[in-house]
Amino acid sequence: MSYNTNDIMGYAQDPIVFSNEQGGNELYEKVKEVMVHGINENGLPATIFEDTIKSGGMFGTKCPLLMIRHSDSSCRFFMIGIFVYGNQVMFALFGESAENTKYNRKQYYQENGNFIKAALIKPDEFKLQSELQWREDILNVFNNATH
């Protein structure tokens, strides 16, 4: 399944720019090596697979995409998609997060004064914290290797 930039649900962190790297496929291969090694070395619950992401129409840009999802299929977390555009490494979120969606919906209703609807939505705080911790652990693999 090829992804499109329209499939991006947000970003896990800001892009990281490498000024001394060539970028492109060479940088992507280095990122892939760091992530696969780091996730395995740290024993993180993750399944890694490769795909592509496309931007624009029929003649748009296509880039390799490293997808990381939680290895427990009962955990409905966002997937993290890492791709390189030029000399920037991007960390996009794909798919759906059940608890994050509930939390955002509750926040939206509270901010817009609909407190009755907000009171009816009850995200599981433990699951939400678990997802945020998992995401942070995955991102730390890359951040610790590059700093």
Where are these regions (language model features)?
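A composition-biased, non-transmembrane "mature-region" signal
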Residues: M1-H147
